[in-house]
């Protein structure tokens, strides 16, 4: 069975109530490719609003979640709180949280486990820095990040994961991995899934690409065998996000 193409829009810390509603209403009314799963991820303050405005075909994701169910964790949001708000997805492991907030592979893996066990699906982000790529360590880095998750998750739980490969050097920089570079890493990730998890996980897990995805480069990237969609940053705030969702039309 072919993997369902997946396009996520990560609004990051951008927008306000009005713009969030406008972006989602634009998606609601657009002629979107029906074979694509679309998920938007606004700032936490607008999650409830996004879920109320978005039609049922559009998923809504938190940009983060904590690994404890409740308690004295100022500023954090629990899995149960997100589920009560009818949020089905969360992004975890984004490079901005790895780099700026010093989140470790192990902490991200624990959060991934807590999210899945609590009923969320996870967009699990991995990727290398420019230094790591230039040192030919790309596969080592993404494998290390994946291995941390593999220690926490059962083989069955990978069915709740979408892997997002985002080379750090391409996020928000305008630099984009070539289609060949992206496909090479996606292929290596799929091989890792087969070797470390199962043949079924390798066949069914969606591996999406992020890093300066735009309406200009999405069609070529979408043609690659192991690229199952996109995690879009800045372009998800613009009308061109519709073109990215429709990359395969």
Swiss-Prot record:
GO terms for molecular function: triose-phosphate isomerase activity. The keyword Isomerase applies. GO terms for cellular component: cytosol. Its EC number is 5.3.1.1. It is an enzyme of class 5 (isomerase). Transmembrane segments: none annotated. GO terms for biological process: cellular response to farnesol; gluconeogenesis; glyceraldehyde-3-phosphate biosynthetic process; glycerol catabolic process; glycolytic process. It holds the Pfam family TIM. It comes from Emericella nidulans (strain FGSC A4 / ATCC 38163 / CBS 112.46 / NRRL 194 / M139). This is Triosephosphate isomerase. PANTHER family: TRIOSEPHOSPHATE ISOMERASE. It comes from the Eukaryota. Keywords: Gluconeogenesis, Glycolysis, Isomerase.
């Amino acid at each position: 069975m072919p993997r369902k193409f997946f396009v996520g829009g990560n609004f990051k810390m951008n927008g306000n109530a009005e713009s969030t509603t406008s972006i989602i209403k634009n998606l609601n009314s657009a002629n979107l490719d029906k074979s694509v799963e679309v998920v938007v991820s606004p700032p936490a303050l607008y999650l409830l609003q996004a879920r109320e405005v978005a039609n049922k075909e559009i998923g809504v994701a938190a940009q983060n979640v904590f690994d404890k169910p409740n308690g004295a964790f100022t500023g954090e949001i629990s899995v149960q709180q997100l589920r009560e708000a009818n949020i089905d997805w969360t992004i975890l492991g984004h490079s901005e949280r790895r780099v700026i907030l010093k989140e470790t592979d192990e902490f991200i893996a624990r959060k991934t486990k807590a999210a899945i066990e609590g009923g969320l699906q996870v967009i699990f982000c991995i990727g290398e820095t420019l230094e790591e790529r230039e040192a030919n360590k790309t596969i080592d880095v993404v494998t290390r990040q994946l291995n941390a998750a593999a220690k926490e998750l059962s083989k069955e739980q990978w069915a709740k994961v979408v892997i997002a490969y985002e080379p750090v050097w391409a996020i928000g920089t305008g630099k984009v991995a070539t289609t060949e570079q992206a496909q090479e890493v996606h292929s290596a990730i799929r091989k890792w899934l087969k070797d470390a998890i199962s043949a079924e996980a390798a066949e069914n897990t969606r591996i999406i690409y992020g890093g300066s995805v735009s309406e200009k480069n999405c069609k070529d990237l979408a043609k690659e065998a192991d690229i199952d969609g996109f995690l879009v940053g800045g372009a998800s705030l613009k009308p061109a996000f519709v073109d990215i969702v429709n990359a395969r039309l």
